[in-house]
Amino acid sequence: MLVRSALGVTCLAVSLAAGIACREVVAPERPRTSTEADFQALVDREWNWRLTESPLFASSIGDHRFADRLPDASLQAEDRRAQDTRAFLDELEQIDREALSAEHRIDYDMFAAQLRERLEAHRFKEHLLPINADSGFHTSFALMPQSMRFASPDDYDAYLARLRAFPAYVDQHIQLMREGLRTGMTIPRAALAGVETSMDALVVDDPERSPLWAPFARLPSTFADGERSRLQDAGRAALRDDVTPAYRRFLTFMTDEYLPGARETLGASELPDGRAYYDWLVKKFTTLDLTADEVHEIGLREVAAIRAEMDTVMRQTGFTGSFDAFLRLLRTDPRFYPRTADQLLKEASYIAKRMDAKLPSLFGRLPRQPYGVAPVPEYLAPKYTAGRYNGNPPDGTEPGYYWVNTYALETRSLYNLEALTLHEAVPGHHLQIALANEVESVPNFRRYSYISAFGEGWGLYAEWLGLEAGFYTDPYSNFGRLTYAMWRAARLVVDTGLHAKGWTRQQAIDYLASHTALSIHECTTETDRYISWPGQALSYKMGELKIRELRRRAEESLTGRFDVRAFHDAVLSNGSVPLPVLEQIVDAYIAREQGT
């Protein structure tokens, strides 16, 4: 999975013309109409506005024009951005959509959907929730050096300007969260237990122990000695006098004010206008016109089907006891857990390299950007999930990273590791996102968007694809794959249960614990994530079900002419798209193949 990014670069489901144009086909150049020129000018203007308003996002995609700034996170700025977005949408609606080419009609619809999503997010006051159970603005700031350029003294001075601006940035977020306390728009208290652990490594007396010191520890050797001393002295001062006190102030606010005042209810439906908010989240994160009840029922059906598979695989291990006894065995037998962090990282790296060798048989196009395997940063690890993909700017200066959580090794099961690695690294998030960054024929607002139902659905499909690639030959590993599949199916039940059906936190933990082989620690951290990030967990299974449905359609339509490499290239050729758009892309691919 990926962390939420600035300005909500996701997209709701959109209705598109039936004749969708797939951009992997190069069409002859055609004169651009004045309507298309007006549309492109608006898109370009909004994109530049977006980067100006979100300089951290700009840095993350390799645009360093605003590298000395942090976003304005004040309440006034949030309201102003909503007004600007409304003005962009009003201007867009004055453009005659039908006068655009088929490709630009797709762009029009997706652009409109992004603008409307931002307005809805502001209407529901999502900006008053700048943190969740395992991350937020405070942890993202500590990751900032990964997306910045450090080639010249000017680059370092820009970084120093951001460090010095951090106290005001923290105060703005405290203002947002105080407004949330006043209006009842808060993260549930239960999901924030232990949140202070994510700040322990950020509130440091020695500046050189801060993760934000890293750029000063690797100053280029080409810098003059005097310049190196100046920058390091300035870095120590900024971390000591600005950053650490701001983190300490935020920690005090969290423990003394926010946690005691946070709501005791769990579900998003308990927030102001909460039922409408959760209904919107279901549609946002699935990109489908479904209700919470419909998603819940789909989840129950998937849970039952996967459980039958799990029973079969359990018997293949030679185990003769009950399902619950088998889960206890998996959770307690030391052979299923790494002894050291190095062992876990080496196992994950080996799985990733094995899959690297399989990629040419499954994909026609492979990305240029490499990836590495690394531990989850220490300050994030206690409340973090088992693994996550962390992308980097697509300019080729840094690889992407598959992060593996080496905290609490007794909870990091090895039988799940093949599925986790295929999801987060290749052929999952790294491959999908790196390829999307290389699609130059779509506008930037699409190229750098991340639609959760597509991205997380692809990640779960990538786990399943491991069967075809020769993974999961060990029955315990295959059970781990099914545990992950069950986990995502159970999310449909648990997320809707928590946010639409009044489930308790313990009820959600118990449901995960009784249906998967996840450790109790993972069941707990996952539940807290669902509580604090409502709707997002629905993306995975709903997206995977749609991709597998479309693959079956292609196989049945093309029979002997079906080429899995061409199918995967078609799915990934347009970047991140809503599921209804993906369906039309695949239908267009099938029609082309049938015509050859």
Model-found features: residue ranges?
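N-terminal secretory signal peptides that target proteins for export/translocation
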Residues: 1-3
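N-terminal maturation segment of proteins
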Residues: 22-596
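Bacterial N-terminal signal peptides
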Residues: 6-19
